[in-house]
């Protein structure tokens, strides 16, 4: 039998080559065992693999028998997803809480299999302007597109849809899926996931709209829904764009001709009179650099979306932006059954920063002239600048994490973090390094990146003060204690290979190199369909703990979240540490009686 992944690669290629193709009989691929090994391989390494839904069902205990039960329930139509367990996490920079839905692991596994099938069809047809929750795309690819393509913009429209993920209309979504996929069983299964409901404080609640945040399928379903918005904006762009031949403005032409006349006069003059005319010549040249060379009759619209956040750049008037905003409002209300937020959908002049994906975006207005060969150019004029919002993002991070306090003169003073004192020295420096690298890596595209140098200083001395406070010592003694011969400081620790030292992260090395010219090709999804290691290990029918090899014995996967948390006291822990794997194929007896000890 041909591997399912090979079939899906062919489907993906067909989807790319024939954009209007409609796909049928996809449900049958959910009745093939090999897709569940791929789904499990994709899921078990995630932190949430051991997080329970409403049932005691996690990545631990996966087996061939479990796959057979899933396939049988899908085949005879008895499968119904369990309600998700509702929990809340804090929103960034807000006191509000974000609802999160935790499905059971069996539901996650089936959702992942459905996601793999849907992705093979939809990924090749999604527009280049969409960057959220897609392979080889990220916040950085969206920002690099803005940097590369938004140059010369005069206005920004910052888009915000009210409660986007909570307000996706189920009937509209299924209708959109049915345009591309003619498979009643697949549509019904997706509808079951949408209508599964949630359990909060052990009370069941129905779901009438939205996709559960935390669900495996939710990001892809949201992209399918918002793909309609992408298509609409690109159609709007075709109507709006007007790139006429640029004509030099009369004011610019008149001043330019006057400068030429003065230049000819200068050749005939001498002495004080020449100096006086030269001064006039320089003043007019300076004024010329501030005038727009051509009439602003061109109209260009550019658009980028990441999940439910989008931004539009407009080369046109403010009235054009208001017209675009009104068109968006009508489309989102009539077609998507959602609302565009009037308060948060802002029209911003490009000389002022517009906020998108945690960056401030603006277009430079520069009168600085640089010589390029024989010609002088305003090299930065009209280029897009990506900036770190230092006051909002970095200042807030420092306050939230209690890294420093602000003195009366507005300067910062690094302090120790009380809540980290019970951690080991190695854990403390690891936390600080992780936070510093995370921020520096995310803001590596910013033109004001070097302003994070002071933030790195605050982080380093807060780390040192935390370790000093832990040991009840002074800052200078702590530095002396952990400094090596090169003058750098780090925390020594020991592993099997010998003694090591973890240094505090070097600020200059935290920034990843980026190329703004990189473009992403729209290619079919390639899975690589050789049988995966996990499938081979399970089908070998050999216990990796006791060595039992019996065709009549059931074999299961034992799963742990982190190998580094294992103490190595038990035989099975030593086996996992030796293999450096989160999974261990064990027989039923070892799993129940040796590892879980009759649990």
Can you annotate each of these PLM segments?
Residues 1-599:
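Non-catalytic terminal/accessory segments
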């Amino acid at each position: 039998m041909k591997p399912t992944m090979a079939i899906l690669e062919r489907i993906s290629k067909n989807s790319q080559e024939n954009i209007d193709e409609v796909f049928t009989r996809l449900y049958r691929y959910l009745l093939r065992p090999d897709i569940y090994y791929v789904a499990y391989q994709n899921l078990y390494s995630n932190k949430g693999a051991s997080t329970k839904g409403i049932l005691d069902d996690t990545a631990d205990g996966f087996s061939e028998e479990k796959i057979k039960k899933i396939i049988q329930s899908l085949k005879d139509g008895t499968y119904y997803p369990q309600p998700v367990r509702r929990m809340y996490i804090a929103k960034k920079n807000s006191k509000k809480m974000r609802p999160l839905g935790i499905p059971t692991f069996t539901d996650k596994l089936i959702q992942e299999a459905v996601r793999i099938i849907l992705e093979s069809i939809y990924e090749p047809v999604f527009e280049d302007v969409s960057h959220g929750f897609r392979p080889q795309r990220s916040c950085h690819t969206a920002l690099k597109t803005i940097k590369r393509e938004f140059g010369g913009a005069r206005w920004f429209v910052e888009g915000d849809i009210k409660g986007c993920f909570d307000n996706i209309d189920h009937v509209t979504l299924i209708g959109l899926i049915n345009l591309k996929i003619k498979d009643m069983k697949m549509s019904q299964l997706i509808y079951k996931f949408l209508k599964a409901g949630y359990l909060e404080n052990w009370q069941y609640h129905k779901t009438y709209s939205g996709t559960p945040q935390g669900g495996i399928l939710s990001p892809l379903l949201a992209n399918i829904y918002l793909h309609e918005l992408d298509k609409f904006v690109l159609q709007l762009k075709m109507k709006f764009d007007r790139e006429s031949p640029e004509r030099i403005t009369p004011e610019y032409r008149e001043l330019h001709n006057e400068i030429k006349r003065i230049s000819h006069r200068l050749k005939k003059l001498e002495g004080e009179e020449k100096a006086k005319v030269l001064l006039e010549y320089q003043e007019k040249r300076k004024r010329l650099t501030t005038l727009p060379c051509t009439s602003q009759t061109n109209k260009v619209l550019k658009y980028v979306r990441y999940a439910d956040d989008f931004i539009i750049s407009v080369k046109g008037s403010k009235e054009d932006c208001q017209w675009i905003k009104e068109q968006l409002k009508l489309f989102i209300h009539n077609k998507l059954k959602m609302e565009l937020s009037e308060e948060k959908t802002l029209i911003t002049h490009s000389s002022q920063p517009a906020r998108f994906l945690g960056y401030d975006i603006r277009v430079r207005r520069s009168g600085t002239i640089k010589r390029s060969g024989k010609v002088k150019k305003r090299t930065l004029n009209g280029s897009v600048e990506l900036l770190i919002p230092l006051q909002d993002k970095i200042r807030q991070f420092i306050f939230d994490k209690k890294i420093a306090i602000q003195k009366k003169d507005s300067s910062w003073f690094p302090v120790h973090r009380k809540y980290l004192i019970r951690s080991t020295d190695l854990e403390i420096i690891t936390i600080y390094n992780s936070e510093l690298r995370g921020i520096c890596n995310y803001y590596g595209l910013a033109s004001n990146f070097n302003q994070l140098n002071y933030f790195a200083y605050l982080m380093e001395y807060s780390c040192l003060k935390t370790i000093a406070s832990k040991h009840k010592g002074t800052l200078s003694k702590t530095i002396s204690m952990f400094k090596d011969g090169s003058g750098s400081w780090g925390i020594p620790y020991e592993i099997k290979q010998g003694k090591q030292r973890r240094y505090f992260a070097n600020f200059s090395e935290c920034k990843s190199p980026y190329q703004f010219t990189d473009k992403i090709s729209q290619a079919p999804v390639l899975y690589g369909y050789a049988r995966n290691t996990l499938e081979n290990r399970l089908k070998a029918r050999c216990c990796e703990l006791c060595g039992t090899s019996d065709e009549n014995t059931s074999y299961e996967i034992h799963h742990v979240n982190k190998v580094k948390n294992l103490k190595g006291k038990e035989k099975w822990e030593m086996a996992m540490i030796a293999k450096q794997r989160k999974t261990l194929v064990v027989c039923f007896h070892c799993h129940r009686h040796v590892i879980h000890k009759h649990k």
